[in-house]
From Swiss-Prot:
Residues 392-395 are annotated as: G3. It holds the Pfam family IF2_assoc. Belongs to the TRAFAC class translation factor GTPase superfamily. Classic translation factor GTPase family. IF-2 subfamily. The lineage of its organism: Bacteria, Pseudomonadati, Pseudomonadota, Gammaproteobacteria, Pseudomonadales. PROSITE patterns: G_TR_2, IF2. Gene3D superfamilies: P-loop containing nucleotide triphosphate hydrolases, Putative DNA-binding domain, N-terminal subdomain of bacterial translation initiation factor IF2, Translation factors, Translation initiation factor IF- 2, domain 3. It comes from Pseudomonas fluorescens (strain Pf0-1). This is Translation initiation factor IF-2. It is found in: Cytoplasm. Residues 137-171 have a biased composition (Low complexity).
Amino acid sequence: MTQVTVKQLADEVKTPVERLLQQMREAGLPHTAAEENVTDSEKQSLLTHLKSSHKAKVEEPRKITLQRKTTSTLRVAGSKSISVEVRKKKVFVQRSPEEIEAERKRELDERRAVENAARQKAEEEARVRAEEEARRQPAAPSAPAEAVAAPAPVAEPVREAAPVVAAAPAADTRKRDEQRRPDKPRADDNNRRGGDGERKNAPHRASVKEKAPAPRVAPRTTDEESDGFRRGGRGKAKLKKRNAHGFQSPTGPVVREVKIGETITVGDLAQQMSVKAAEIIKFMFKLGTPATINQVLDQETAQLVAEELGHKVTLVSDTALEDSLAESLKFEGEAVPRAPVVTVMGHVDHGKTSLLDYIRRAKVAAGEAGGITQHIGAYHVETERGMVTFLDTPGHAAFTAMRARGAKATDIVILVVAADDGVMPQTIEAVQHAVAAGVPLVVAVNKIDKPGADLDRIRSELSAHGVTSEDWGGDTPFVPVSAKMGTGVDELLEAVLLQAEVLELTATPSAPGRGVVVESRLDKGRGPVATVLVQDGTLRQGDMVLVGSNYGRVRAMLDENGKPIKEAGPAIPVEILGLDGTPDAGDEMSVVADEKKAREVALFRQGKFREVKLARAHAGKLENIFESMGQEEKKTLNIVLKSDVRGSLEALQGALNGLGNDEVQVRVVGGGVGGITESDANLALASNAVLFGFNVRADAGARKIVEQEGLDMRYYNVIYDIIEDVKKALTGMLGSDVRENILGVAEVRDVFRSPKFGAIAGCMVIEGTVHRNRPIRVLREDIVIFEGELESLRRFKDDASEVRAGMECGIGVKSYNDVKVGDKIEVFEKVQVARSL
């Protein structure tokens, strides 16, 4: 017998000696020291104690797992063999006799309960049927009296039908019992495992099967048949059939609440209405609008579709991010007076920039291309009466959007009208912009030093458009000025500052900066540059700004003279560098707390703008499909347009898209801010377009492609020139018209016969000149009866090339011999005339 010491045993089982001694004392062993010996029987006693303390079962394992593996070889074509290995695994669980007995008793009790319930139900049905027959008995007097005792034969069918009727309740009862005791193994499990439960439960199932064909007491219904009450059916199948799930069609239309944002795709709309997308597409086809599952619908179209299909529509605004941004921008602080923002507006060449030059003591107008302003210029001027910020807007008709933007960003509008020119179209437009923006007007009647200046005529013309002078009882100051001589400029500034005092303009310098983009451009060395007018708060270098759908950190700020500054307060125009793109003029600028918020809102705005643009473009295309059917395709002049600033690009696109007619049109296939690059040249090459550069030039790569491919590239610095050239190009695309000019008219006085030419008309030329080999018309009583060619023209037997008015001649008409006296022969020519827009 092998003996080891307590210490050796502790080392062997990897436990401390003290811990092992304590466990041995708990097991009832007499060991107290590490040097004492431990016998095998003592080890067994210790092991038994440890197992019992850990609640381990010492009996034999109740679960046995058998695994079997067979390998076979499968031969395939090409003398190849594949080895196939099949593995099988079976688990046998030994059940205790107590569990088997309890299961048998439980099933016996259940069966007795089911039989009792079935017997009671059968007796109740027999009693009801007997009462029915008893009530019907008096209505048939011919029936024998002993028929009243009809309930007697009921007893035998009750006994035989009971097990059959009980099949479904038995399944329900068993199911409830299994739910109450989920840890008990089911009889079906025993069938699969092949345990003792199969042998014990088999007789009970067989007894139900044997009685199944018994006649039914009550007539079968459709529900009973669907629940598995069929003759000879198996209990398990009945249970599965009874528990099968299914969908029932709704008894009426289901009205759903559909939430529609600014845009929604056809697929998303169908999902919200719980219908197939094909139904919506089919409905839109009925409305005359072809659609696809991924097509973006605008809010109005989606609302119409949903309401027509009978659903309730809730319009929602996808502005959660915008609302949270607006909440974060709220700031309370002390408001202080600020300088007014004044926009100078008026017709082209009426002296707006010259007036500003005199106020600023600068020479801006002299350096402008063509002598006209083509950008919005922003300046702030320190005067004796305080600081004023001026916005100089273009006066050309193409810059309508710029002037509208200037009116929105301003406090006061100076309307410049030339005294010698009067009220012009852009003057009226400027008045409309100011009235729409609710901005007070100050009228500056410029060029008052010129002869022929008539101030009363200006007052009269403007009063017709709702601008009445203070001298005539209105509320608009009229100040006569001369930008050249400086006359009346001080009075003009005084009138502007007086209006500013009435408006009580205030701002909060301690708040985060907020403003509007006046202009933006792409500088080759500095990247996107935006001219921003700060309207409230203070903009500082290093601030994270969100500008429309662009964002970035302000890396540098420059004033209007190009000098770097660190911060800009209210009503100060500055140029900022550091944005990730060129924002659109008119976009709002705001300082945000962190870059994450700015990026989220910028990406949201970009996606929203793209969806709305796609929806509108697609709607426009679909509307034009049916209009253009059967018509000739328009000739299109494709243009790739690059400009120096965003505002000029918008103005040019608007002006060019407005050109054209039913036969020709302009399509700007690409546009942007900055120089002409290689990608622009490739786009022009692919789309067969003309390259236009407005105040920009092409780089080396673009010039190389233009030379190799022979592209048409033109530079401009005046907007008039672009519009004129495009008009000429469109005129050339129109082709030419054929016009007829009547050369002469001859009256037939007599008809002769010639063997060579047939009928010869002796004529007197009464109008113009008759030429040989020209087309003619024969008119009888001023009605055209023949159109052909003059074959022979003679005068006194001599051939003549032409015969003038008042002279006689002989005319032979080719292929026509029905000339009569009194007819008129009209000689004409066809001339091609160039068309114009």
